[in-house]
Amino acid sequence: MYIVSGPRPLSDGQSQVFGREEEGVYPPGYVRFMQRFGEGTYRGWMNVQQPDREVLQPFAEYGLWEHDDDSPITEPQIAECIAIGTTVDGDFLAVHPQTAQLLWLPRHAEHIQAILLQSRERNDEGLYAAVLDEIYRQVYGSSQEGVVYYEPWTGTRSHLFLRLPPGEDQPSLLELAGMCQASFPPDLCVENEYTCSLFYRELGGYVRFNYAYQQEVAVFYEQDAGQAFAVIEAWLLSKGCERVS
């Protein structure tokens, strides 16, 4: 698993959130993953977070999901759930300690889903990555393609947005991404029809070309990577990009 920037493991005080009696409530590997890498975003879709016992309490009164005899929990039991993650689309991943269930609370669907995981023998920080991949398959009905990477929330991340204006002598954004790869071979490349992200350890971040918008380029970097950032920024400006204020 590629780690985008230096992880921020949980402090001793934060680790105390996971009492020995409660550790079995969480999905396999979750506690070790958090203790090793801290909070962050997994493969661009799941925000892995510390347990939150309060965020779902108001949802027990909102009537967002339908409940019947096949529902894994009742509407009042939503308030008892512990959120451990959110997707970039606003879905919740949570555990319900009293019934020992892992639950998916979707933002754009009417039913809460119980996630049934396959048993696994290993128990390390890589285990939870496999669990998240399995959750993705169950929820979306397909496997997530591409490489496995994790973006820790360091609290020291900076960013710059640029625009590649259209013009006869200008490369397309797709061409610019290819030129960047050739000039600065990345440590990792994640690309699809909508976006291309080139990851660099020197940046502690990545350069993202937004194919969907056709003009947007963004550089995400750690504050102590100023020299590497300056080189990338100067190159992008030399190719016709403009800073977005």
Annotate each language-model stretch with its function.
Residues 1-96, 136-245:
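A surface-exposed partner-binding patch
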Residues 103-142:
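Compact, glycine/acidic-enriched structural inserts
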